[in-house]
């Protein structure tokens, strides 16, 4: 049985990883999360009482607390997902992204290195530091049909992607300089249950159910590759347990869709699954409202996931159609979860005008 320290385990992808490990493996999890606005322990209700699960409310920028957690739990691996991740928010509040994504990653690397250096030789050899990143570090594919491979040059476009690119470089440098056994993964856009409603898909679902406008940036033709979060969680666990030290693995869903197509598909699913509409709404699609594009908005991201398929045998199980249907149905069935989220300070709107 491994003990895996997961940072950001109360976030969207992190909670999916924690649920996957507790539900489908014999490994134990130590969840380290600061619990910012997007961290939600209600996403972990099913594992909260499991003896293989522990939670520590710790900020990765707090080195002393990280040292305590490593000493107390003595993990066999780290899966680093703690990050500020919303592009729109990074445009207006870049400092938070620099602090968490760069300084926080540095602190975690140093705490992990100090812990790793004093491990017994057998555990020392088996230890892994898995850094979870994004395809946005590669920049924009523009109008081409190309895919980002693991060797694509970095060209981040936003404060968010620049901060993640910086953290990727730190992780690789700690392997090359100090020998810390690191692995990096870069993923495409995730979606699925428990997604915080500032992101495109849950925002559209909840606004539509409330009869509010569905704000779409620019002409809506920006293309993203969509990855169901539970498929991603499987891939991440496979990488931390089977991946090769020093390697990078791109993880994608092979589901390229224009944003406007995604929104229209959500509307069509809601017509079927939630036909009783809010007052004054004839069709959900009538709520679509085009708004000013955000600064530096990338036209297209898409990753080539051939390497992880070839080397580790991972494939996504969900198509975009099956995954989106499951997601819409989950939000319809879990009103209490998202109402509790919305009762906080968050308001359903698109951010990122830079004003």
From Swiss-Prot:
Keyword vocabulary terms for this entry: Lipopolysaccharide biosynthesis, Lyase, NAD
Function recorded in the entry: Catalyzes the dehydration of dTDP-D-glucose to form dTDP-6-deoxy-D-xylo-4-hexulose via a three-step process involving oxidation, dehydration and reduction.
Biological or metabolic pathway of the protein: Carbohydrate biosynthesis; dTDP-L-rhamnose biosynthesis; Bacterial outer membrane biogenesis; LPS O-antigen biosynthesis
EC main group: lyase
Keyword Lyase set for record: yes
Protein's organism: Neisseria meningitidis serogroup B (strain ATCC BAA-335 / MC58)
Listed SUPFAM superfamilies: NAD(P)-binding Rossmann-fold domains
PANTHER family assigned to the protein according to its UniProt record, in alphabetical order: DTDP-D-GLUCOSE 4,6-DEHYDRATASE-RELATED
Name this polypeptide is given: dTDP-glucose 4,6-dehydratase
Cofactor entry: NAD(+)
MF terms (GO), sorted A to Z: dTDP-glucose 4,6-dehydratase activity
EC number(s) from the headed UniProt entry: 4.2.1.46
Gene assigned in the entry: rfbB1
Family: Belongs to the NAD(P)-dependent epimerase/dehydratase family. dTDP-glucose dehydratase subfamily.
């Amino acid at each position: 049985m491994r003990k895996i320290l997961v940072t950001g385990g109360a976030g969207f992808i992190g909670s999916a990883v924690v649920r996957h490990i507790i539900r489908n493996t014999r490994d134990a999890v130590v969840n380290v999360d600061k619990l910012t606005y997007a961290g939600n322990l209600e996403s972990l209700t099913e594992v909260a009482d499991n003896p293989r699960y522990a939670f520590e409310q710790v900020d990765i920028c707090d080195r002393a607390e990280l040292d305590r957690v490593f000493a107390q739990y003595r993990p066999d691996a780290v899966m680093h997902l703690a990050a500020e991740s919303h592009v729109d928010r990074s445009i207006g509040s870049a400092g938070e992204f620099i602090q968490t994504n760069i300084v926080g990653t540095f602190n975690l690397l140093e705490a992990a290195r100090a812990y790793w250096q004093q491990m017994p030789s057998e555990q020392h050899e088996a230890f892994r530091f898995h850094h979870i990143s994004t395809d946005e570090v590669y920049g924009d594919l523009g109008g081409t049909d190309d895919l980002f491979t693991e060797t694509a040059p970095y060209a981040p476009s936003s404060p968010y992607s620049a901060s993640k690119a910086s953290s990727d470089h730190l992780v690789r440098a700690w392997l090359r300089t100090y020998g810390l056994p690191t692995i990096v993964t870069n993923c495409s856009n995730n979606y699925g249950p428990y997604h915080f409603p500032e992101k495109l898909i849950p925002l559209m679902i909840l606004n539509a159910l409330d009869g509010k406008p569905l704000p779409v940036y620019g002409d809506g033709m920006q293309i993203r590759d969509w990855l169901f979060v539970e498929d991603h969680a499987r891939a991440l666990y496979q990488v931390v347990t089977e991946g090769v030290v020093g390697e990078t693995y791109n993880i994608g869903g092979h589901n390229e869709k224009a944003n406007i197509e995604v929104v229209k598909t959500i509307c069509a699913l809601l017509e079927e699954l939630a036909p009783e509409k809010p007052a004054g709404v004839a069709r959900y699609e009538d709520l679509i409202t085009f708004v000013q594009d955000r600064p530096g908005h990338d036209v297209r991201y898409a990753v080539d996931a051939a390497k992880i398929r070839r080397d580790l045998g991972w494939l996504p199980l969900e198509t975009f159609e099956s995954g989106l249907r499951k997601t819409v149905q989950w939000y319809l069935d879990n009103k209490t979860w998202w109402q509790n989220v919305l009762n906080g300070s968050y308001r359903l709107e698109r951010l990122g005008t830079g004003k």
